[in-house]
Amino acid sequence: MACTLRLTIAALVLLGICHLSRPVAAYQRCSRYWYSWLPYDIERDRYDDGYRKCCYCRNAWTPWQCREDEQFERMRCGSRYYTLCCYTDDDNGNGNGNGNGYGNGNGNGNGNNYLKYLFGGNGNGNGEYWEEYIDERYDK
C-alpha cells in the first residue's frame, strides 16, 4: 500500500513537472472571448456568423511599436489591463479565410490585407475588421 502510494505521488509529481515544462497556452475567459496566453503573444479566437476569426497580439507599450498592419489595443481582462499590437486574418469580419492569398479569394475581396496575402481570405473588402470588432465588443 505504501509503495503504491509513493509511486502514485511520484507519478503525479512527474506529470506536473512535464505539464509545467510544456510551452502550452493557458486559456482564460474574459467577457465572451477566449484568450490563449503564449509567451509574449496572445492568440484571440472568436466566433461570428459561424466562422472562426483569429486575432494575433503581442505585448506593446506604445502605438508606435505596432507595424502598419497592426492595431494598438488596450484590453481589460478582470482587473488587469494589457496593451497590445494586434492583427487579424479577416479584413472585415465577414469572410471565412479561404482563398489563395494573392488575389481576391472568391471574387469579392480586395486581397490587400497582410494576412490575406499570407493565408488567403474572401472578405468583401468594404470595411475594416477592427471597426466592426471594436463596435461588437463594446456594444454588447
From Swiss-Prot:
Signal peptide (UniProt feature, chain positions): 1-25
Superkingdom per UniProt: Eukaryota
Tissues in which the protein is found: Component of conchiolin, the organic matrix of nacre. Only expressed in the dorsal region of the mantle.
Main location: secreted
One GO cellular component term: extracellular region
Keywords annotated in UniProt: Disulfide bond, Extracellular matrix, Secreted, Signal
Family, similarity comment: Belongs to the N16 matrix protein family.
Role noted for this protein: May be specifically involved in the formation of the nacreous layer.
Protein name from the UniProt record: N14 matrix protein
Protein's organism: Pinctada maxima
